[in-house]
């Protein structure tokens, strides 16, 4: 059944590529993957393979990639992605020697791919459970590790009807899981080699903070040295349901400056954002100059790659996605010692639950709950600062997963 589903997905991508640009990139990338390997793989080199579904999973694996690169330079790094949103952004990443798409997990694709490259070990990040690739790696006695994985009782592996697919988990040499519940669930289905290490994203956001870049135009907008400086609210990875809530508030409150870094930066969505903003001076980052940004009320980030550094300039952050499929990366904001707000779809995100528990994160349900929180932060600077410190402390307290993983891997 699994292989039938994989062939159906492959067929769907092939057909969809005729009409959809994202699927077209994925299809072409998958078709070229083995050719790229045949051209670039050095026969005598030892490759460590990292696979990430998309950009978020790559960021979880990145601390491991760079630590191995630094401490074990004799290895070369192969990095694969499933999604264009990961590959297209990181295809020129200097931390890997070869970067490709991973072809759909059919038997034929897996065999061709692993004939073209024979890694000495593999790391699959978080939710990557590709049976045919994993089965071949296991058959060849190649160690394969699941990193930053997290499991819940409602996942298919732990249901009576998912026992067949659950066999894929037995292909892993070891699991590096985020919490005790994940380890216990694996133990219940006969998998004992699981180590609790936490989430490598905590290490990653601390690295980002350490290496953050100055953004002169954002500094000009924030104007921190001004005697009458306004507080700055940063909305990261926002979607329209998020924007409708916080923009309604800021249309009524002029004591804040607002930076919006929407998840989608297409012109249609940017026009929608502009239509929601009333009576404020708005500047798009790509059009910003020193002379027009200082007295602006709203700065819209209409390009990628800046958000993690932009959070540095905020006093309160909002992370989008909580009114849709799920919140985006709250740790990128929390590491900067400020309160982090997000929508209600956060129950499956351990880091959001941790921030809520420790007092650095706040759940927003609607305009009224958002307004109450923002008014409190505006009126009580000591409270806002204390909540921000709790957010930063939470991130620092859970760092160290990268070293824990590497101490349990034979390199």
For each of these PLM feature ranges, what is it?
Residues 14-211, 215-217, 224, 234, ...:
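Active-site and donor-binding regions of nucleotide-sugar-utilizing enzymes
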Residues 113-115, 168, 292, 310, ...:
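Structural alpha-helical scaffold elements that stabilize or flank donor/cofactor-binding regions
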Residues 142-144, 258, 282, 340:
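Hydrophobic beta-strand scaffold residues
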Residues 201, 283-324, 329-330:
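Donor nucleotide-activated moiety binding/catalytic core segment of transferases
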